[in-house]
């Protein structure tokens, strides 16, 4: 038996074993798209909901570490005691949001609207916050260490 013949025999054997596993050409394949429904559900399932409208929702005590909420509408959202460490909140609207006791360390707050938000007792260490809007923000007892958060709100 020659080497050429042995190679051909081995190739034929491998081909015969794998043939049942091959897809037939032209067989349509479908991909099922699963919707996560409401924006709140999408945020909790995927950890991202950029541009979502979450106005008035309750996310109290949720673990939202590193979530993507860029340009989200979070006006009036209850985020008391929520963990938003490392979250991307750039461009988000958080006016009148309740962030009492929330953890926002290392969050991106670029261009975020925090007007009239309640950040009392929140931890906002080393958050990146250029162009943040803070008129009327409440921050008594908040730890703003290293955040360069230029606030305009009063102490209560």
Regions found by a protein language model. Give the residues of each.
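Polar low-complexity intrinsically disordered regions
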Residues: 1, 15, 24-27
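Bacterial N-terminal signal peptides that target proteins for export
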Residues: 2-12
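Bacterial N-terminal signal peptides
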Residues: 10-20
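Tandem repeat scaffolds
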Residues: 26-156
